[in-house]
């Protein structure tokens, strides 16, 4: 059986393979299978991970578990502590957190018990000394973080700033450009942190094959190209 073809039911209570129910049981919740063929499930005994045959990977049960990314899975222990485990069910580091994300590019955002966010590496080590009000996933070596001032900046994998500009809100880069908001509205910026056009929008989306959906300040919906020129009005 090819685990990549295993699907979750629409109500997320069981698994299907080529339209047939797997493992002969319903769960409270099932999540998708991830490499190398492991899925997170929740039943009356608690949260745990199973392989493609439906066999639990370990005996311990958690309050909740999530999928594997970079060979690490986020779990919530019964005392409320969040941390990561490896594919054998072994805890990856000693520290517990108020929340942990999923590893992306071998780095992960975490929320400290006393408040604030940081990034940890695959061994649970902080990658910089700063504590931020918020931080997100790394994508292509860059993450968006919220400073104590409330503004957002882009940082690289070593914690240094990618460019000198701060914004009211800031997304990660997608195909060379990121969405950003200043006091005038939303725009797209390049890797230097500068806007790629002069106009501002009420709402925008990342570029998709050279085009992006935007809502003008007057409410008109458009599609623009990477020069900021209107391709069509919707």
Give the residues covered by each predicted segment.
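Residue-level detector of conserved, function-critical positions
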Residues: 1-234
